[in-house]
From Swiss-Prot:
Highest taxon of source: Viruses
Main localisation: host cell
Localization in the cell: Host nucleus
The name this protein goes by in its record: Non-structural protein NS3
Signal peptide span: none
Function comment: Plays a role in viral DNA replication.
GO CC, one annotated term: host cell nucleus
The keyword Cytoplasm is annotated on this UniProt entry: no
UniProt keywords, alphabetically: Host nucleus
Length: 87
């Protein structure tokens, strides 16, 4: 029992380290908003994921990247410090 708990804890720690590495090597949390494609049973693409829908007033188009959205002068995804864009 104790060995199984140790193995599970080690596995979770390894997954956490892998996640941190992938986020640091990528674009921060921007990977959460990347568009994915649907695939059929033959693993062939069928159509693009529908656009992200939100009612949050904090999200608007960013000058730096049209794939993510925000309403802040400091873009938390890409570090863009330019003023916000009117929508």
């Amino acid at each position: 029992m104790a060995q199984a708990q140790i193995d599970e804890q080690r596995r979770l720690q390894d997954l956490y380290v892998q996640l941190k590495k992938e986020i640091n090597d990528g674009e921060g949390v921007a990977w959460l908003f990347q568009q994915k494609t649907y695939t059929d049973k033959d693993n062939k693409p069928t159509k693009a994921t529908p656009p992200l829908r939100t009612t949050s007033s904090d999200l608007r188009l960013c000058d730096c990247n049209k794939q993510h959205q925000h309403n802040q002068s400091n873009c938390w995804m890409c570090g863009n410090k330019r003023s916000r864009r009117a929508t």
